[in-house]
């Protein structure tokens, strides 16, 4: 495919890949912690695509527990599409719970009613259900994360004090996991969208026994990967060694990347060298 077309379809391809993995792994259920849609996007083909993918999970007998985040709350698509019966949406009016009796798992969550939800939603979440594995689903960057808007702010200590065993968080695009008595996890987004979202992207496959997380496996779903490659060219006398060093660095990056995965790379040259003036006009 042409690079521009591949970029345009990458996010959908990544989501379809996630559904494929869920079916192949025969997961018991899927959790989506918000931002299916991109704000005020009005492309209903995106919504229809999402419904089709949820239908594939329904056919495989996989329930989905979906929480709407800030972008979903402002999306017209969210209000207009009818989802398959296997998709259970957390209410925006108050925190609600869904039980999976066969697995003794209960999920607690609250969707965003409006995009700019700046109140701490956590006090409204119910107490943990004794003897069950309690999962909290929340769309938040937590407090003190300057890189993200202050939506549904709360602290890690508040999450831990709630008494749930696992927190499935959305909003933050970078993957991050904190393990301990309570597991707090952002899987990040499924597909990097631009150069500020570099490296592998994907989801988390969580394994649980009784009341504890036994394994967290990273599932890579990106179909095109962004990378920022910094090359130190200090001391280069002319552009020839610069080109050679960049080529070597790119070769190493390609060796470390799955063969099927296209790369979009920004190369940054650092260091003082005599080749600086020559390189300024080089393309």
Task: Tell what function each PLM region has.
Residues 219-283:
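Accessory, non-catalytic peripheral segments of nucleic-acid enzymes
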Residues 1-3, 207-232:
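Domain-start "cap" segments at the beginnings of catalytic or binding domains
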Residues 35-39, 141-143, 272-274:
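A short, flexible beta-alpha/helix-coil linker loop
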Residues 1-48:
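N-terminal active-site segment of His-dependent metallophosphoesterases
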Residues 33, 170, 270:
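Conserved residues at the C-terminal ends of beta-strands
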Residues 29, 40-215:
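His/Asp/Glu-rich metal-coordinating catalytic cores
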